């Protein structure tokens, strides 16, 4: 089976291209003009049945808009949905489990949202026939004998009510008008009186979740519910979903592995080639599913979908060799909010995590270190070079390559810079306009731009936001390696505890009252900081015996009771 994908957003025919793909195609030269041709909108198109997979058009396309992929012929029987000619397609389909929580795991652009749309009835399986899609009866017949058939039968008879929390926020108006009940007490009272336009990302996420939970539905779907939420609220939402929807069918898409593991009963892995095609795996228990994803190999299907196994490592110990920077105790007042910090020092190779809920001064802290905010005693003059990636990233008009050149005009000649942009996947974005980047692509550009700068201290505010699991792990590895090799240091604000655990040798734990006061502890070993945080929220964690990833214990389980009794809330 052959797949030809042309990304119309990147194909610049006919304005800036004379169809070089057609000019170089051997089949076109032989007289089969319809192998590569222009569609009515002027964009290039490929007839897959005539293509011989020579790959010449892929190599010669100046805009990197073409992909030719060969799959086993038997995959044609599993084709479930295709958007249009030469577009993304998905094989197999996500299968909801009655009165259980199903988690979907996979890279961005691999078909998770497409499958959610299929399950919610927003789009319907067409089995590749996008011009003449099948009827409901034909769809149900096609899935005869499969676990998904009864669900789709009920869905198309309108006997299944679905509540969907979308990935993108769709809020407009007063919060109290959007959330009539808030049955589970998710939203703070002060937020209820505000307009949705004034909400932070975390507040908007909580509103969307509350709206979804207020529905009386049969199936609840949550697309990336943990985005923008702090650790405390991630735990709160996971617990609410588990308890409030214990007798409902639930589907969750999430990139935070700790939360996904804690929240779900079953996992389906989506793999393939991002933006080209996605394949849905069989159903697995959550622990097995996540460990299988980490291993990159599906034993039941005998498929290796990644050529390496993800290694979950504990952050290496710090050397405390040479002090790079020290800061005194300081205070920052912004309106009614006040931040009071302890003094601290960073050593060569240090990566220090910042842990705490939203609204208690974490971003204020690193902005003060970066010299963006004045303290009560004036701006801090630390006498060092600082590179800073803010939480909110501005998407300026212009090419990605120009944005990188603004950081360092000579970056194409520097091996270190090229390695950074290659490992983060920014190379394939060079000809894109920054304004057209997705949230994840913009995040990777911002991280690359920060790491390319010559600095003594690197400050990262939520670097994993909008990144999929593999991009998060690549970012962890990259930051860790650069700080270790260059003997520089970094401070990382992060809500993904696996990120903190894997990268940060030390951490600072923030406490206080959101929007009013923030207090910092002294810098301490990360294991101690996580232990203290977990104690404050009455949650225990352990390491998985196979993958070594952190896992949350179920409340009142044997391990949970034993760890709480011993005071070891994070069992190493």
Where do the model's predicted regions map?
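Conserved ABC ATPase "signature" region
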Residues: 181-194, 414-429
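Hydrophobic anchor residue at the start of the ABC signature
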Residues: 209, 237, 447, 475
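Helix N-cap at the start of a conserved alpha-helix in ABC-type nucleotide-binding domains
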Residues: 231-232, 469-470
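Conserved ABC ATPase signature
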Residues: 195-199, 203, 433-437, 441
């Amino acid at each position: 089976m052959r797949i030809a994908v042309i990304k119309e957003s990147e194909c610049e025919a006919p304005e800036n291209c004379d169809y070089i793909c057609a000019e170089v195609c051997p089949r076109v030269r032989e007289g089969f003009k319809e192998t590569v041709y222009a569609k009515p909108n002027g964009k290039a198109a490929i007839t897959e049945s005539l293509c011989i997979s020579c790959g010449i058009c892929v190599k010669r396309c100046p805009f990197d808009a073409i992909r030719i992929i060969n799959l086993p012929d038997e995959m044609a029987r599993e084709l479930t949905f295709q958007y249009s000619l030469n577009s993304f397609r998905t094989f197999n389909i996500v299968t909801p489990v009655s009165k259980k929580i199903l988690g979907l795991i996979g890279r961005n652009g691999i078909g998770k949202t497409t499958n959610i749309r299929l399950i919610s009835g927003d789009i319907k399986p067409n089995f590749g026939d996008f011009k003449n899609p099948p009827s409901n009866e034909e769809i149900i017949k096609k899935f005869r004998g499969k676990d998904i058939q009864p669900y789709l039968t009920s869905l198309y008879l309108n006997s299944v009510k679905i509540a969907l929390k979308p990935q993108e926020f769709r809020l407009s108006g007063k919060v109290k008008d959007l959330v009539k009940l808030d049955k589970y007490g998710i939203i703070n009272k002060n937020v209820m009186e505000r307009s949705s336009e004034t909400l932070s990302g975390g507040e908007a996420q909580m509103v969307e979740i509350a709206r979804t939970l207020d529905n009386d539905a049969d199936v609840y779907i949550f697309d990336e519910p943990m985005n923008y939420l702090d650790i405390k609220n991630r735990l709160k939402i996971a617990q609410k979903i588990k308890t409030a929807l214990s007798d409902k069918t639930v589907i969750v898409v999430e990139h935070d592995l700790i939360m996904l593991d804690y929240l779900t009963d079953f996992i389906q892995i989506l793999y393939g080639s991002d933006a080209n095609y996605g394949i849905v795996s069989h159903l697995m228990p959550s622990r097995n599913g996540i460990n299988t994803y980490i291993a990159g190999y599906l034993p039941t299907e005998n498929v290796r979908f990644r050529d390496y196994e993800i290694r979950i490592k504990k952050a290496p110990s710090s050397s405390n060799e040479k002090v790079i920077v020290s800061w005194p105790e300081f205070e920052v007042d912004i309106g009614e909010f006040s931040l009071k910090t302890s003094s601290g020092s960073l050593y060569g190779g240090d990566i220090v995590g910042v842990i705490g809920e939203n609204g208690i001064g974490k971003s204020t802290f690193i902005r003060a270190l970066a010299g963006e905010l004045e303290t009560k005693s004036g701006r801090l003059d630390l006498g060092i070079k600082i590179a800073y990636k803010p939480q909110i990233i501005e998407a300026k008009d212009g090419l990605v390559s120009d944005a990188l050149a603004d950081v360092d005009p000579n970056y194409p000649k520097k091996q270190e810079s090229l390695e950074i942009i290659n490992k983060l996947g920014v190379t394939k974005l060079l000809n894109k306009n920054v304004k057209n980047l997705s949230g994840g692509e913009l995040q990777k550009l911002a991280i690359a731009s920060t790491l390319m700068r010559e600095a003594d201290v690197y400050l990262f505010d939520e670097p994993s936001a909008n990144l999929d699991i593999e991009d998060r792990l690549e970012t962890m590895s990259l930051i860790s390696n650069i700080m270790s090799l260059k003997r520089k240091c970094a401070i990382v604000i992060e809500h993904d505890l696996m990120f903190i655990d894997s990268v940060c040798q030390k951490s600072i734990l923030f406490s206080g009252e959101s929007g009013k006061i923030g207090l910092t502890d002294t810098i301490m070993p990360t294991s101690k900081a996580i232990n203290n945080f977990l104690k404050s929220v009455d949650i225990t964690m352990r390491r998985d015996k196979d993958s070594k990833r952190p896992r949350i214990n179920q409340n009142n389980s044997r391990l949970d009771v034993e760890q709480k009794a011993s005071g070891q809330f994070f069992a190493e």
